[in-house]
C-alpha cells in the first residue's frame, strides 16, 4: 500500500476523519516504540492509517469493537462479509424497507457485528444511533439495491485492507469508558483524541456533556503521554469556545475543510479543524 493512499475502513460514521488523515500523519510525530492509544477509536480510520506496531483502541460502542476484534482474530473475514452481504442484500432488493427493519430487529436481539455492518452500510446517511433503551433506530436509506456487486466488493476490499494492516501487530480493542484508555500510559506513548461534540447527543456513545469534556482536557494535561486532539475550531456560524478555554496551551495546527448538510451544493459549509498537540 502506498503511503499516500488513505485507507477507508468498512464502518461509516458522520464526522469520519478520512479527509484529514494526511494532515494528521504529517503533524503527528511519535515514538515508534510506544503505544498508540485512542479512547474514541470510532471507525478506526486514524489508527488504520497511522498503522502503529502497538495500539490500544477503545470505544464505548461494543459493536464496532466486536467487529474489529472479529476481523483481527479471523472469525470475520472479507469472504464471510461478502457472502453475508450478498445473501441479505438480495433479500433487501426484493423486500426493501421491510427487510431492513427485519434485520434491524434481529440486530437489536442478537447484537451480531455482521448485522451491525449490514445496517451501517444500508441505513440513512451512515448514521450510528441508538435509543435510550440501547436499540439501533436509524431508518433505511431507501435504496433496495444498496448491496450491488460493486458496493459489496468495495466493502470486501475494505475488510481485507484493515485485516492486512492489523496482521502481525500488537493491537488491543477494548469496549470501555474513555478514562480507562489513559491508565498506564507513559511518556513513550501517544494518545490521539477525537471526542464527540459538546452538548450533542452522540447517540452511539451517549450524551457528551461539557463537564466530561473538561475532564478529558484535565486527563490530557496530566498524563505523561504525548497527546494530540482533533477538534473543530470554527465555522461560518460560531467558534468552539471550549477549545479556546481548555486547550489554548497546546500547539495548534489548522486545516480548512468542508462539511455538508444535505445534498445541495449550497449546503456546503467551510470548517476549520485543529490538531492541538501537547507541548
Spans of features found by a protein language model:
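The conserved SAM/SAH-binding core of class I Rossmann-like methyltransferase domains
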Residues: 58, 176, 230
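A residue-level signal for conserved active-site and pocket-lining positions in enzyme catalytic cores
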Residues: 42, 68, 117, 227, ...
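Short, solvent-exposed loop/turn segments at secondary-structure junctions
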Residues: 43-46, 62-64, 122-125, 178-181, ...
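Glycine/threonine-rich flexible loop motifs
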Residues: 201-207
Amino acid at each position: 500500500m502506498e503511503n499516500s493512499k488513505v485507507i477507508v475502513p468498512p464502518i461509516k460514521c458522520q464526522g469520519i476523519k478520512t479527509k484529514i488523515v494526511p494532515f494528521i500523519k504529517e503533524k503527528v510525530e511519535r515514538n515508534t516504540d510506544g503505544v498508540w492509544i485512542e479512547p474514541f477509536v470510532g471507525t478506526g480510520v486514524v489508527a488504520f492509517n497511522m498503522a502503529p506496531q502497538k495500539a490500544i483502541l477503545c470505544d464505548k460502542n461494543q459493536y464496532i469493537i466486536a467487529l474489529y476484534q472479529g476481523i483481527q482474530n479471523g472469525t470475520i473475514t472479507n469472504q464471510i462479509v461478502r457472502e453475508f452481504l450478498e445473501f441479505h442484500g438480495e433479500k433487501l432488493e426484493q423486500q426493501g424497507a421491510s427487510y431492513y427493519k427485519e434485520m434491524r430487529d434481529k440486530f437489536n436481539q442478537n447484537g451480531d457485528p455482521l448485522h451491525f455492518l449490514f445496517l451501517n452500510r444500508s441505513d440513512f446517511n451512515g448514521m450510528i444511533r441508538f435509543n435510550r433503551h440501547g436499540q439501533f433506530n436509524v431508518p433505511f436509506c431507501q435504496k433496495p439495491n444498496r448491496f450491488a456487486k460493486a458496493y459489496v466488493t468495495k466493502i470486501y476490499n475494505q475488510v481485507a485492507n484493515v485485516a492486512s494492516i492489523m496482521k502481525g501487530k500488537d493491537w488491543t480493542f477494548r469496549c470501555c469508558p474513555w478514562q480507562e484508555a489513559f491508565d498506564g500510559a507513559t511518556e513513550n506513548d501517544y494518545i490521539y483524541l477525537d471526542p464527540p461534540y459538546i452538548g450533542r447527543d452522540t447517540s452511539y456513545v451517549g450524551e457528551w456533556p461539557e463537564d466530561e469534556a473538561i475532564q478529558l482536557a484535565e486527563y490530557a494535561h496530566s498524563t505523561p503521554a504525548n497527546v494530540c486532539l482533533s477538534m473543530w475550531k470554527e465555522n461560518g456560524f460560531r467558534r468552539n469556545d471550549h477549545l479556546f478555554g481548555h486547550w489554548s496551551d497546546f500547539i495548534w495546527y489548522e486545516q480548512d475543510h468542508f462539511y455538508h448538510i444535505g445534498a445541495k451544493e449550497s449546503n456546503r459549509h467551510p470548517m476549520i479543524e485543529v490538531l492541538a498537540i501537547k507541548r
